[in-house]
Curated annotation (Swiss-Prot):
PANTHER family: OS01G0950900 PROTEIN (PTHR13018:SF141), PROBABLE MEMBRANE PROTEIN DUF221-RELATED (PTHR13018). Acts as an osmosensitive calcium-permeable cation channel. The keyword Ribonucleoprotein does not apply. The chain crosses the membrane at residues 6-26, 94-114, 146-166, 351-371, 407-427, 442-462, 494-514, 546-566, 597-617, 623-643. This is Hyperosmolality-gated Ca2+ permeable channel 2.5. It holds the Pfam family RSN1_7TM. InterPro entries: Csc1-like, CSC1/OSCA1-like_7TM, CSC1/OSCA1-like_cyt, Csc1/OSCA1-like_N.
């Protein structure tokens, strides 16, 4: 890739970003767009916060502004934590980690690495003229002592990354434990999820077995339980009932306006259908029918957090395949349909998910290889001679090779997070948060394999496969060379993902167009509701982590990329802070359980950076530097093992010490009984089939709580 191609990519991405941000700053002032740009603040839970919209046709309403940008840097972390939860704060701190790390690397690169790379005694003028290699480690001659500068920078960057990681892990853990104390009213702190519940031999019901077991073995701490039921039939009928009630309201409204006999007849028919469905629901919700639909799953509530944590983290039954316990997710986080999946089928589901993810990865190797073919224009002309026609249009070849490959790749990659989230759902996770965490893992490794490694192989090594087969020992050296050769492509990828990607994220162009089409077609005359969606951690975290990985690997190899990454993380911080404040809803809070996975992604990035440098030092005939880098790899691995021992268990489990401290605080304030009694009924309000419909009720007011905590 030539400097002209890189300049074309930067110009296009900067232009798109400026236009998108300009449009956003104007469109968000228009009252009709509030359902898109202020969806969270318009929702019922956050409607108390006023909106500053221009209702009159005044000039400021149509002028762009940047007032929303400094807002992101003014809000303290404590306020983010109280408004959005610790998961949102973890994402914000991920962007801050990127800013701090790459800012230091940029200063180091500008002061040491760039001068050393550029002013080399054996620079090749032709390479400096036609490529960016003059600013990379590729410009250093074999065996040069200048490589010790790169070696020193590698150690410095690695230790700084480990220092930041340790600092973040420690601080987030402290905030997590404090947040658990602040959220002591949450039902999941008192509740244990029990799976594989056996049948009671006396009464032939599972609810009875749960009650007998915990009453006997947790006599003084057990409070109550709630069985789960196969409510697919009930959910279907409840949905049908809701639809009929809405239709009935519309027909009554029409009758008032028209005062016709035809409308009165239709209303009578709808009321009769509604009564029939109500009786069917009432029948299915009888205790006899519910017992027949019992699932081997129960939520068991304890009288203290300490006893709940002990029960969740210990083996209950002599047969480890029965009465399997774990801390329950919070009620709004439960994946109700996955709880109905039998435990013995879950391993098959997981194998199927792994196979599907592998097939998806292989399938996407085709477009990635094609994209790299476009990026290498000289090779593209050999493979596809008609491509030479673009040379007749001035500047077009720079656009095609500089901007188009990264834009196409980003377009293909957009659908991957949603596909992986669907696969994670099929894996049978008990909560939505665990589904998102699994999706994060799959998306990150998919991006690492397809976007990074496959881009290296298909872009730099495709024409040397035969040589690899004949000389397999040279593969590490060739891979190290490939990393250096692909610096320009990944620079354009960072530009596209950051400038264009973040700008289009905040613009929400697709949703704006959909809202306009809906308003003038099937949604005409209907009330417009906010487009409120859950925050897409599964999409944001892996993408940002991939950019950290690319930046780390190229921190010593191509320091010219580092300032672009500082801009990438600054823009990402501003954009996603705005989305948290105004657009996306926080539907659950895991109290920071995303961080250990983010830590792992960054650890993998550091290891890849160090291994790449070992290969590059070998390629540059500096074996002493390569050997001296091996202890750094071992230190990094040892540090990661330390973090697994020191921090990770407190994210996986509910520490007994913390549970006791919260219990003591509750007992001191006289709130313990209130909290565990509320916890006993919290899950009833979220399971669809636990809503009773009485046959004596009015057809338009048909729901009330179904059962108590012991539904047996």
């Amino acid at each position: 890739m030539t400097p002209e191609s890189l300049l074309a990519s930067a110009s296009i991405n900067i232009g798109l970003a400026v236009v998108a941000l300009w449009l956003f700053s104007v469109l968000k002032k228009q009252p009709r767009n509030a359902v898109v740009y202020y969806a969270r603040r318009l929702s019922d839970r956050h409607h108390h916060r006023p909106l500053s919209l221009h209702s009159s046709l005044c000039l400021p309403r149509f002028l762009p502004s940047v007032a929303w940008i400094p807002r992101a840097f003014r809000v303290p972390e404590d306020e983010i934590l109280s408004r959005h939860g610790l998961d949102a704060l973890v994402l914000i701190r991920l962007f801050k980690f990127g800013i701090r790390f790459f800012l230091m690397c940029s200063l180091l690169g500008a002061s040491l690495l760039l001068p050393v790379d550029y002013y080399n005694e054996s620079d090749l003028p032709t390479r400096r003229e036609y490529s960016m290699d003059a600013f990379t480690i590729s410009n250093i001659t074999r065996g040069s002592n200048k490589l010790w500068v790169h070696f020193s920078c590698l150690w410095c960057i690695s230790f700084y990354a480990l220092f930041l990681l340790h600092k973040e892990y420690k601080e987030i853990l402290v905030i997590r434990l404090q947040q658990m104390k602040e959220l002591r009213h949450r039902a999941d702190q008192f509740t244990v999820l029990v799976r594989q519940v056996p049948l009671c031999p006396e009464h032939n019901t599972r609810g009875c077995a749960v009650d007998h077991f915990f009453s006997k073995h947790h006599r003084f701490s057990y409070h109550s339980h709630q069985m789960l039921y196969d409510g697919r039939d009930l959910e279907y009928l409840l949905g049908k009932q809701k639809k009929l009630k809405k239709e009935l309201e519309d027909k009554r409204h029409t009758e008032i306006l028209s005062n016709g006999s035809q409308e009165h007849k239709q209303i009578s028919t709808s009321e009769e259908k509604l009564r029939e469905i109500t009786h069917m629901i009432y029948h299915l919700q009888s205790e006899t029918m519910l017992r027949e639909k019992e699932l081997p799953v129960a939520f068991v509530t304890f009288k203290s957090r300490r006893n709940a944590a002990l029960a969740a983290q210990t083996q209950q039954h002599s047969n480890p395949l029965e009465l399997i316990t774990e801390m329950a997710p919070e009620p709004r986080d439960v994946s109700w349909r996955n709880l109905a999946i039998p435990q013995k089928i879950l391993p098959l589901n997981k194998i199927g998910v792994i196979l599907a993810a592998a097939l998806l990865t292989i399938f996407f190797a085709i477009p990635v290889t094609a994209v790299q073919g476009i990026a290498k224009y000289e090779k593209l002309k050999k493979w596809f001679p008609p491509a030479m026609a673009i040379e007749f249009i001035p500047g077009l070849s720079s656009v095609v090779t500089g901007y188009l490959p990264s834009a196409i790749l980003k377009g293909f990659m957009y659908i991957i997070p949603f596909a992986m989230l669907g696969l994670a759902y099929l894996g049978g996770s008990i909560s939505n948060s665990k589904e998102e965490i699994k999706a994060c893992n799959m998306v990150f490794y998919f991006l690492m394999g397809n976007v990074f490694f496959l881009s290296l192989i298909s872009g730099s090594l495709l024409d040397e496969i035969g040589e690899y087969l004949t000389h397999p020992r040279d593969i590490p050296s060739h891979l190290a060379a490939a990393v250096s050769a692909q610096a320009e492509f990944f620079m354009t990828y960072i530009l596209t993902d950051g400038l264009s990607g973040f700008s289009l994220e905040i613009l929400q162009l697709g949703l704006i167009l959909f809202d306009i089409i809906r308003s003038y077609t099937y949604g005409r005359g209907k009330e417009r509701t906010p487009y409120l969606f859950s925050f897409p951690y599964f999409r944001v975290i892996p993408t940002v982590s991939l950019s950290i990985m690319i930046g780390m690997i190229y921190a010593v190899v191509a320091p010219l990329m580092l300032p672009f990454l500082v801009g990438y993380f600054c823009l990402g911080y501003i954009v996603y802070f705005n989305q948290m404040e105004d657009v996306y809803e926080t539907t659950y809070d895991t109290c920071g359980r995303f961080w250990p996975f983010i830590h792992h992604y960054i650890f993998v990035s550091i290891i890849l950076m160090q291994i790449t440098m070992v290969g590059l030092f070998g390629l540059k005939s500096k074996p002493s530097a390569a050997i001296a880098t091996v202890p750094l790899i071992l230190i990094t691995i040892a540090y990661n093992e330390y973090c697994k021992i020191r921090f990770l268990p407190s994210f996986k489990h509910f520490p007994i010490q913390t549970a006791v401290e919260i219990d003591e605080e509750d007992e001191k304030n006289g709130e313990m009984e209130t909290h565990y009694v509320d916890a006993a009924t919290a899950y009833n309000r979220h399971q669809p089939c636990l809503e009773r419909v009485s046959s004596a009720e009015s057809p338009t007011n048909l729901s009330q709580p179904l059962l108590g905590t012991d539904s047996i």
